[in-house]
Amino acid sequence: VEILIRRHNRQKGGNRAAYADLERAGAMFVYCGRPGPLGNPFRVGRNYSKQRAVDDYRLLLGEDYAKHFPADKVEYVRTRALERIQQIAKKVRRNPTAHRIVLLCPCYVEGEPCHAEVIREKLLEVLEVAK
């Protein structure tokens, strides 16, 4: 399975036009922004870099997340994200022609950190374990 990351175009119909070739090839598109289950809860801001937001998202989805965050504050967000990743993996396993997933993230810029990279890593882990 190939997992691509592309920028989500917020204009109505923008993604469809930009990624028509991928759509024709049967790619599965997954939105990774807020307010969806895969949206990064760590917001980039004055004192919070993009890299730190990605690093914290990686910690959040990791096994040792409770060492880094108060469990009662992040459990819901973490569970939603991991469940969504499992759902996507299940869809891929059920559909033998689903060989390409496109993660659409509003913040994605090639060469810069993006939490969709963490989602790709987790998806590949889940799909590998299922083999």
Sequence positions of predicted segments:
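Residues lining hydrophobic/aromatic ligand-binding pockets adjacent to catalytic sites
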Residues: V1-K131
